[in-house]
UniProtKB/Swiss-Prot annotation:
Binds 1 [4Fe-4S] cluster per subunit. Binding of a [3Fe-4S] cluster leads to an inactive enzyme. This is Aconitate hydratase, mitochondrial. PANTHER family: ACONITATE HYDRATASE B (PTHR43160), ACONITATE HYDRATASE, MITOCHONDRIAL (PTHR43160:SF3). Pathway: Carbohydrate metabolism; tricarboxylic acid cycle; isocitrate from oxaloacetate: step 2/2. The lineage of its organism: Eukaryota, Fungi, Dikarya, Ascomycota, Pezizomycotina. It comes from Arthroderma benhamiae (strain ATCC MYA-4681 / CBS 112371) (Trichophyton mentagrophytes). PROSITE patterns: ACONITASE_1, ACONITASE_2. Pfam families: Aconitase (PF00330), Aconitase_C (PF00694). It is found in: Mitochondrion. Its EC number is 4.2.1.3.
Amino acid sequence: MLTTLARASAMLLGARGFASAADLDKKVEMTNWEKGNYINYKKMAENLDIVRARLNRPLTFAEKILYSHLDDPHGQEIERGKSYLKLRPDRVACQDATAQMAILQFMSAGMPSVATPATVHCDHLIEAQLGGDKDLARANEINKEVYDFLSTSCAKYNIGFWKPGSGIIHQILLENYCFPGGLMIGTDSHTPNGGGLGMAAIGVGGADAVDVMAGLPWELKAPNVIGVKLTGQMSGWTAPKDIILKVAGILTVKGGTGAIIEYHGDGVNSLSCTGMGTICNMGAEIGATTSVFPFNDRMYDYLKATKRQSIGDFSRVYAEGLRPDENAQYDQLIEINLSELEPHINGPFTPDLATPISKFKEAVKENNWPSELKVGLIGSCTNSSYEDMSRAASIARDALNHGIKAKSLFTVTPGSEQIRATIERDGQLKTLEEFGGVILANACGPCIGQWDRKDVKKNEANSIISSYNRNFTGRNDANPATHAFVTSPDLVVALTIAGTLNFNPLTDKLKDKDGNEFMLAPPTGEGLPANGYDPGRDTYQAPPADRASISVAVSPSSDRLQILEPFKAWDGKDAKGIPILIKCEGKTTTDHISMAGPWLKYRGHLDNISNNLLIGAVNAENGERNSVKNFETGEYDSVPATARAYKARGIPWVVIGDWNYGEGSSREHAALQPRHLGGMAIITRSFARIHETNLKKQGMLPLTFADPADYDRIPPTAMVDLMCTELAVGKPMTLRVHPKDGASFDVKLSHTFNESQIEWFKNGSALNTMAKKAQ
């Protein structure tokens, strides 16, 4: 009898009696798409019993997932916020923009097959121009070289491959691969979407994915756990999205850093599984490691609807391991009464500027935001479920019944081929098209900047509103003057009808085709399709049985794919008299460090994509973007050109950064590029978690000012000495600053390196360290 499961009661989900070792010793496959990969609740329960005996305290659900996946539950040091956990994830998932570099790195490891189940999803390289099928056909043509590389490499290395048009990675994962209590890493920052099915799904850089695909344990600093207790029940215009919009306003873009957000309380049971996914998805915007919901009936219903009832039944047996213990302690607790929660709109330019709808009109006026709404966009990995589309269609139908349509431009991005086919069958797609919607491909599209926007000129101030998750400057359309707001699909549709930000559907009236006033009815929609899901077109490629004869060709003349050369090892010396490439002022996201949009096509070619290094960052010296002074010539040039000039002369350099440097996407290119162009260290007030790890993996030094105020003391034109020989666990490092005018001074720097990560730096990268051990 397993003690963890012996505590199980009949309280949850119809579970009856107690679970024994025999109850958990079953072969239930993780997914319908693979054979021989099983959910190992028995091993997870055994690991939890070992950890419980050691810690002797109640555990949060997040802790249960992590500790049940420990590589060494007997010997692992466990202290929230301090220890580095070595974990064994159940799965790895990559999207096509990050998969290229991950697979190129995996190839260099020389292994015949991935050691952990993995999938690749083609969703990032499809640009929104004319509409779904035409855009997909164009993407297949211009990205053929990359898709062929991914298809053949996946076949070669035993990786499941989801073709272009299949849908957005996170929707596909929720529909097919996520399971309660599992641990998955994904090379996309919105991987936490899987928390909607009770899975700890964590965004990582490609180098982390390579480690796990190669069979190594994955390292994660033991997160703190922030509890969000939900009470009451939502109604009317309030949607699940409003919960995370509210939480983002409370915690801000860095308030969740180093923590898992764990939702609990009676209010959880009123949310759909996909609604919970929405909330977890956007937890990435507050810096959270991931977000989770405990297993409940809504998750079971979703598993059943997606033809995975056997997983739901197995989860009911393991129910005790899929919820927090009574009296579990949280490092911070937030309470939200859903009965009182208002719809929210967040933005512009940052996802944590939260405004309830009742105050939004006033905020528009006070801040002089452009009130005319140019475009409304629904869909994306955050909000493209059947429930989202049904509720949006109900509002659109209400408008059509009154003889009016969308006043603003309106786009719809289905999250997957399954969603597209199902809403086509059930009529929501037709309603949204009649309303004026342009149906885009089942892909990321405008959410990640894959949008060939024509209705405004560059630098023309305008407003758009979307159901997306991220609204940084220029992210959607490369126009820094676009004021982008994020909200629920419901409010997007409502404001699109009005054509203005100065509309509150809870209080304001519209005019029908005859000039009569009316109010929109609150949205309605089923969480799951009554007639089941329609899978639509077959978009999956399984690895073949015979993989030995498959060859993965990369042309040496390709401008999109490039075989990687190992980075040089550290020379063992302090770096003296080196320049500051740029002192970044204000928000510096991974979009600023390595832009997406038109640059996505170079994600498999490190040298070419390095031509966008930090071109979006603001130079504190002159307030300009992509204009820095070469200390040798005294001339101003672009950031990449200046970095290349230093590299050609064998001169390493550093970057000075502000708060939460590297927030946003998980793209490891933002760490690979500075390393490739000769960078040695990034020194900031603070880092976003994924980017800090990515820099370490590539052999760079992510360092923080021991006193954040020292950021202001560093002249952008100063030369510096970096005492690399001081690098040791838990010890500060010294930065000696030599201003052009004035005396030199020392600044103390902090870091989070452990012993194994220091080896990455010494060897030149984590991949070099892996190769060295394999020799």
